[in-house]
Each structure stands twice: as structure tokens, then as C-alpha cells.
């Protein structure tokens, strides 16, 4: 009689135990027996040795299977060997040999560190560049001749959003025809080339390539209320830099880096290390903030007739190009030396879809819709507060040097605050789980946003108190708005971004790739552009940004409420997908090992590899 049991060990009763021990070492795994140059003389894990039981809990009568006294007295050796299905592990290297554990450093396996350290360095380089680009783009477009802060809402709505949609469509097409490696290099290399060309070619030639005369004629014809749209034409190369800097944040950070991180990490590793990725990233914020501050002071100390922006841009763009090349090198190293984790093979393979089919599929998915709600809600909420704050900042620091220096300090403070939040985030994930972590960011943004709007609305009564602190109401609003942005962005980097990226991991590859492209490249600018559209509508309706402040506060409350509802819905779907994935993996591990239970021969010992056709004289089954 022969049966098959779904288990992880091979239970065999050798016919000739003494002879078999010299030929077949059960303690050796299949891999060792096939490939080892010299078989090691290791004893297997024996349940009995020369008739004496090693494990007192082992009983000869199990679940109705009767074994005679003669059979019990027969001397035999029963050894259990791990089949090592799937993972290649060897169970039981004998009494004197312990199971070899993976080497660890500070309690973390070396194989895991080979992923985490390069990913942390990549995140450092990416956010170092992003901080420099983010601080520089505002100064370029706001302080340029013939431009002002009014250009920003128009840029986000009518330039940045169409560019983001166009990139998403192109990225979706490329993802169907290129490998992951080729797609990564195809996307990031044009960014590196452009930023180098801007610092060394486009900016020095800006006086020749900007249509100043045409812009002046249009401004005279259309009137000053169209100064924002006309400024886009007037300083088109600066606006292109602004858009490319915005796309660096949404494309390189969200799509390329997090997509790569999701590809090579498991959910358990993500829960433990995703919040810590930001530690290196926020050290980058601190250093890049100091870099911007240094070049701001350098421009201030240059002699007359020297274009400070030209000098500083060449230096900063050189740093950006160097960091970009370092990102490519780290990506190559990880792909070369770090193995990919095994994923569940039972997931449905999605067919290749066109652009419209992809969009329809993503819109029809409640999971993707909730993710999109999170991203759009954050973009609108932070934009409603941030643009108002930047208008106050422009009024307080009209000089480019002062504006840039303040932004450098702001980035440094953001890095310090986020670094602290990163240290606390792992505790939040371990103690309270994904759902609570996802709800902290909207709560922080709501509370700090209310404080900022309240100071603007009721700044008059607070003027005497603010004067005692040596500040004007305008400067106080600038500082409170800065604190609001610092707390909101630190919560975003330490909790919101890891939560969002962890939500992609249980998805199948097709939904993961195209969903990230649609959400991160389109929904992120859509949130910013949506906030800009709301502000433009309010300004046109109520005459000024100050008059529309109470209504902006009410809109902020509604959006954050929808954000919290989407986070709650996504929490349930995420936990359900995780449970399904774990169940599939367990089933794969169980089904990959089939263990034959062999019969006994006349000597009372089992025979290994007996076929069903064996004669009954040679095989006497036990009594059931």
C-alpha cells in the first residue's frame, strides 16, 4: 500500500539500515546529494537508534495503526529528512550539527541589508536632487522679470498637468514593450541630460530665447489680469524647468524608486524598512537645504555685474547630474547582485492592455480608486495651504537671495522633523498597523491647516501679542505656515508615502505597474492642479485670496474627511489581499512536496521506492 501525505519531511524505513547508511545519508538534502563534491559524514535526525527511542513522545501505536510486538522489537533506524521544497533548506543535519542560519549584522540578515542599504542610498540621492530642484524652481519663476507668484497656479493647471498626463500615456506604452531595467534607464536619463543642459546652456542663453517683446505686446493688449498666463510664454524655459522639477518628484520618486523597491522587497521587509528609507532621505533634506543656503549666500557676496544665478545654477546642476549618475549605478548594482523575492505564482496574469483599456481597468478597481483618492486629497489639501503661505512668503522676502535662503532653512527643518518622525514611524506600524498610520497624515494636515487659516483670519487681534515677540503679523503668518508645511510633509514622508507604497505590493504586476503610473504621475499633479483651480475660482469669485480664506478652510475640511474615509476603505481591502497572498504562498509550499509512505517487507522494515505493482509476498501492509 502506498499513500501520499502533504508534509515537509520524508519518513522512510530502510530495508537494510546498515547498508543504506553508507550509501544514502538521509541527513543530506537533495541539493547536497546531487552537487556536493565530497559527501559529508553527517548523521541524520534519528527518531530511534539501535532500537532505543530518542524522543520519549514517540509511540508505536498511532491513530488506530496496530504494530505487533515482534515488529516493535525489530531493530530499525527511522530517519526524517527535509525535502527542502522550494527553499532548498535541509532539515536536521544530525545530532552534532545545527541548522545553519543566515549571517546577520545588528540582527538583520546580510541578504536583506544588500537590498536596504542601496535603496536607502538611492532615496538619499533622489530626494537630495528633489530638494535642490524644488527650492530653485520657485525662485526662478516667481522672481523672474515680468513674473510673480500668480504664475504658479497657472503653471500647475495648464502646463504641469498636461505634461504629466502625456508622460503617463508614454510610460504606459513603454511599460508594455520594454523590460523593467530598460524602462528605468529610459525614463531617468533624459532628466539627467536636461538638468545639466539647463544649467550650462539654456539659462545662459535665456535672454536670447525668451520672447520679451512679444510678451510685452500681449500684456499691453490683454491687460495686467493676464500677467500670469503671459509670464508662462515670457519665461518659457524657466517654466519648463519648473515642470521637469515637479515631474522629478512624481516620476523618479514615486514611479521609478518605489516601483523598484516594491519589486525587490516583501511585505514583511516593507513594514520593517520602508519607514527607515526616509532616514537617509531626510539626511539628504538637511544637507541639500544647507547646500541651497550656501549658494544663496554665495550669490549675495558676488561682486556687481556678476550673474549670481548663472554661477549657482551651474554648481547645483552639476551636483544634480552627479547624483543622477549615482542613482543609475546603485540601480545597476542591486539588479546585478540582489536576487528578487519569490512571489505567488497563482496570481492571474493580466493581458497587455492599450492606454484606454488600462485607464478603464484602473477606474473600475475600487482599490485603485481609493489609492487615487488618497493622492488627490493630499495634493489638494497641501496646495490650499501652501500657495497661500507662499504668497505671504513672497511679500515678506521679495529678494531672490532672501527667498532662497529662507527656503534652504525650511528644507533643513523639514529634514530634521521628518527624521524624527521616521524614528517613530516603525513603532506606529508595529503597534497600530497600516490603517492608523495611513490616517495620521490627514489628521496632522487638518489641525495645522486650521491653525494657519485662523491666524490669517484673526491676525488683527493677535497683533499686540505678536509685536511683543518682535514680529509683525505677516512674519508670524510666514512662520506658522512654515511649521504647518514642515509637520505635514514630515508626516507625508514618514507615514503617508510608506503606507501608499505598501498598498501596491499585494497587487499583480500589471495593476502595480500601470496603477502606479496612473496614480503617481496623473493623480499627484491632478491634486495640485485641482487645488489651484479651486483657488483661481475663489479669487475670481470673491476678489482676493484673503476674502476666500474662510471658504478654503471649509473645502479643506470636506477633502480631509473624504481622505479619511478612503483610507478606512483601503485598510480593509489591503488586509484582505494580504491574507489571500499568505494563503496562496502556504498552499504553494505545501503542494510542492509529496511524500510517499512506504510499506514494510518481511523483515519489518519499510522499503523505499516500492511500486504499487510489488508482489504481496514482499509487501505486508500494517493492519488498519
UniProtKB/Swiss-Prot annotation:
Keyword Plastid (UniProt): yes
Membrane topology: Multi-pass membrane protein
InterPro entries: ADP_ATP_car_bac_type (IPR004667)
Annotated Pfam families: TLC
Domain of life: Eukaryota
TM segment ranges: 108-128, 182-202, 240-260, 315-335, 446-466, 545-565
Transit peptide: 1-79
GO CC annotations, alphabetized: chloroplast envelope; chloroplast membrane; mitochondrion; plastid
Protein name: ADP,ATP carrier protein 1, chloroplastic
